[in-house]
């Protein structure tokens, strides 16, 4: 998801998406640790999405 799309969402929607992504990151980490993760690029994508959401939440908090 692009940062511009994230900026149009409300804080509640962003927090819900953040919780969802943190759960997804946990699942991917467990799969990687057990050697079951085939598409390792997903870890990077989820980590980046989490960072983008946190950045937008910080921007909204400053407004």
Curated annotation (Swiss-Prot):
Keyword Membrane: no
One GO CC annotation: cytosolic large ribosomal subunit
InterPro entries from the UniProt entry: Ribosomal_protein_uL29, Ribosomal_uL29, Ribosomal_uL29_CS, Ribosomal_uL29_sf
Keywords: Ribonucleoprotein, Ribosomal protein
GO biological process terms, semicolon-separated: translation
Recorded GO MF terms: structural constituent of ribosome
Entry's transmembrane regions: none
Family indicated by similarity: Belongs to the universal ribosomal protein uL29 family.
Protein name: Large ribosomal subunit protein uL29
Native species: Aggregatibacter actinomycetemcomitans
């Amino acid at each position: 998801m692009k940062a511009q799309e994230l900026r149009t969402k409300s804080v509640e929607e962003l927090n819900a998406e953040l919780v969802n992504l943190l759960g997804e990151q946990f699942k991917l980490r467990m799969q990687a640790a057990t050697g079951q993760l085939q598409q390792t690029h997903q870890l990077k994508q989820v980590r980046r999405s989490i960072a983008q959401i946190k950045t937008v939440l910080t921007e909204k908090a400053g407004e």
